[in-house]
Amino acid sequence: QVMTVSTIKELASDLSKKEINTLLIEYEATFPFQKHATLCNQLAFSRSEVQDIVSYCTSLGIEVIPLQNCFGHCEYILRHDRYAHLREDSKEVSQVCPLKIEEAKKVFREIFREVAELHPSPYFHIGADETYLLGSCAQCSQVNKSRLFVDYIKAMCEVVKEMGKKPIIWADIILMHPEAVQELPKDLIYVDWNYG
């Protein structure tokens, strides 16, 4: 279910009263992409609506951090033929193949920049949770899963840092591969969560 601008503002107002100062927004297909307009669904916000949300939150002392998935949870991207070359699996279109680093960087550099343009926060969340298809494709099956994860996340962090932003990821997958944490950027921020 997509929240309306007014509903998000009501939520922000409630958060402000509770002295909460950060709101993470995952837009998916409701972000008003321009170069990648194929991704927008019929409920997509306009650019001015996103600016209105961010401005309102800022006026309440709430920082809006955008979450733009680039690894798992990319169904709304990978279902389109234009992005089919990035799929980890031809039938299950939820995850980007971590060996397609250069192709993915090209696409997500553009997507990240569009999202970042409307969010002054120094932080940029790239998701990376529930990448359960790691090692599914024939090429990936020959590579260690933690290696696949680390190399891909390092590449996406580079793209985030090119914009002058600090990257954030969910911590669930790296907690399954704790041996790999030393290889990830030292300034990468991990957000832990559970299924409650």
What are these regions (language model features)?
Residues 112, 175-178:
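A generic local structural motif
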